[in-house]
């Protein structure tokens, strides 16, 4: 997987990378290691929730100008855990579903390397000052 400059210390800790980014959608990948697992040797739910939160929020932060950095905070999020994962690469996909100038709603899914659904979620996000929507 291609190395990227970390977006934050937390991103560096978890280890996800952006693999695809388009207006309204983003795809992340995470190569699982032992430190992502819980005591049952499955991916910890917090890791899955973090992947969903990041994919869903990043989906609404796209800008065609790479110099424009848009930021948002999570207002609410629901996560449903469907099946366990313990090895391989996870893929998280976030998609914007609606919103306005200051808030947007997204959904997301996490899949294992075999395409099995591991978790899904929905979230509402508020754009930070200076990050308001550039339009449709």
Predicted regions and their residues:
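Terminal targeting signals and extreme-terminal segments of soluble enzymes
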Residues: 1-136
């Amino acid at each position: 997987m291609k190395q990227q400059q970390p977006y934050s210390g937390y991103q560096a800790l978890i280890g996800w990378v952006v693999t695809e980014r388009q207006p309204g959608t983003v795809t992340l990948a995470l190569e699982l290691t032992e430190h992502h697992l819980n005591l049952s040797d499955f991916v910890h739910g917090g890791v899955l929730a973090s992947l969903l939160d990041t994919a869903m929020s990043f989906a609404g932060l796209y800008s065609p100008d790479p110099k424009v950095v848009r930021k948002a905070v999570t207002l609410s999020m629901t996560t449903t855990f469907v099946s366990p994962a313990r090895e391989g690469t996870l893929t998280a996909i976030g998609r914007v579903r609606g919103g306005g100038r200051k808030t947007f709603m997204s959904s997301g899914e996490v899949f294992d390397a075999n395409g099995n659904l591991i978790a899904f979620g929905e979230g509402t996000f508020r754009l930070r000052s200076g990050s308001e929507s550039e339009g449709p």
